[in-house]
């Protein structure tokens, strides 16, 4: 195993500090980082995409686990520290200076890959929703192991009837399995954020037949966009949705937070079947 200087020394050497504008918080605890890198399991010689590696704390743990890492970093200040890591692990780390929101990750990776990242807080949810979207399923990613604020993590794994349950839960659970294997105390970060964090782990399941991802996304967006309203009000903007509720035994007086993932899937399937498709064959 290569001998690496302590991460704090690397940060001091390169004059790095976490950027609030970029939503950065650095993790130094090597044991904690090793545990995070261990969640996907069996990373030896597997392709891993990391977003926002910063000075490379989690990157070290992933390389130590044997992964081939592609890291996308927007902060130019962090590039020299990551370049040093590339030299220690030749051929194992590819660093891309760019905005992860503007890159095609599947095209970039060119093979099945796991995503493991301490996501910058300001783009984390948007990236997550993007990975969960699209009509092509299963996706090219084999698992997502992501650090979020604990409140966001709880929204992803929540169940109907709870205050945390909403659009994120439905998008994460309708064709994937989502869990929260680890909570991370705020004191583990530099600088310590105001809130606790947690790791979410997501693996793709089979795609339910006859359901369009776009239809489901539109339904959840409308339903949870006005979550205090009854479905007959909140779904008015989705053509045919209110009329279709009765066909799948969902009372129109219910609110979105009581509707299960399975019920949303059934509604999307029925809605798709009742409207002419633009795709032939």
From Swiss-Prot:
Catalytic activity, EC: 2.1.1.182
UniProt xrefs under Pfam families: RrnaAD
SMART domains for this protein: rADc
Entry GO MF terms: 16S rRNA (adenine(1518)-N(6)/adenine(1519)-N(6))-dimethyltransferase activity; RNA binding
Catalytic activity: adenosine(1518)/adenosine(1519) in 16S rRNA + 4 S-adenosyl-L-methionine = N(6)-dimethyladenosine(1518)/N(6)-dimethyladenosine(1519) in 16S rRNA + 4 S-adenosyl-L-homocysteine + 4 H(+)
Main location as per UniProt: cytoplasm
Residues the entry annotates as binding S-adenosyl-L-methionine: 25, 27, 52, 73, 99, 118
Compartmental location: Cytoplasm
Alphabetical UniProt keywords: Cytoplasm, Methyltransferase, RNA-binding, rRNA processing, S-adenosyl-L-methionine, Transferase
Source organism, top-level taxon: Bacteria
GO cellular component, one term: cytosol
Enzyme class: transferase
Biological role: Specifically dimethylates two adjacent adenosines (A1518 and A1519) in the loop of a conserved hairpin near the 3'-end of 16S rRNA in the 30S particle. May play a critical role in biogenesis of 30S subunits.
Similarity annotation: Belongs to the class I-like SAM-binding methyltransferase superfamily. rRNA adenine N(6)-methyltransferase family. RsmA subfamily.
Record PANTHER family: DIMETHYLADENOSINE TRANSFERASE, DIMETHYLADENOSINE TRANSFERASE-RELATED
Name of this chain's protein: Ribosomal RNA small subunit methyltransferase A
């Amino acid at each position: 195993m290569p001998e690496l200087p302590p991460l704090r020394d690397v940060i001091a050497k390169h004059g790095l500090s976490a950027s609030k504008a970029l939503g950065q918080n650095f993790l130094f605890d090597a044991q904690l980082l090793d545990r995070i890198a261990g969640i996907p399991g069996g990373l030896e010689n597997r392709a891993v995409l990391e977003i926002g590696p910063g000075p490379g704390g989690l990157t070290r743990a992933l390389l130590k686990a044997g992964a081939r890492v592609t890291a996308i970093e927007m902060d130019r200040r962090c590039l020299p520290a990551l370049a040093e890591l590339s030299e220690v692990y030749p051929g194992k780390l590819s660093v891309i200076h760019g905005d992860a929101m503007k890159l095609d990750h599947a095209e970039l990776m060119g093979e099945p890959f796991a995503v493991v990242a301490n996501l910058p807080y300001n783009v984390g949810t948007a990236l997550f929703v993007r990975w969960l979207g699209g009509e092509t399923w299963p996706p090219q990613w084999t698992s997502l192991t992501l650090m979020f604020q604990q409140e966001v993590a709880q929204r992803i794994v929540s169940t109907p009837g709870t205050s945390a349950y909403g659009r994120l839960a439905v998008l994460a659970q309708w064709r994937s399995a989502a869990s929260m294997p680890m909570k991370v105390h705020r004191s583990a970060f530099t600088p310590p954020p105001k809130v606790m964090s947690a790791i979410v782990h997501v693996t793709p399941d089979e795609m339910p037949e006859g359901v369009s991802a776009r239809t489901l996304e539109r339904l959840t967006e409308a339903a949870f966009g006005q979550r205090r309203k009854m479905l007959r009000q909140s779904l008015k903007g989705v053509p045919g949705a209110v009329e279709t509720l009765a066909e799948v035994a969902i009372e129109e007086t219910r609110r979105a937070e009581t509707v299960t993932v399975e019920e949303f899937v059934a509604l999307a399937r029925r809605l798709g079947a009742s409207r002419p498709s633009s795709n032939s064959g």
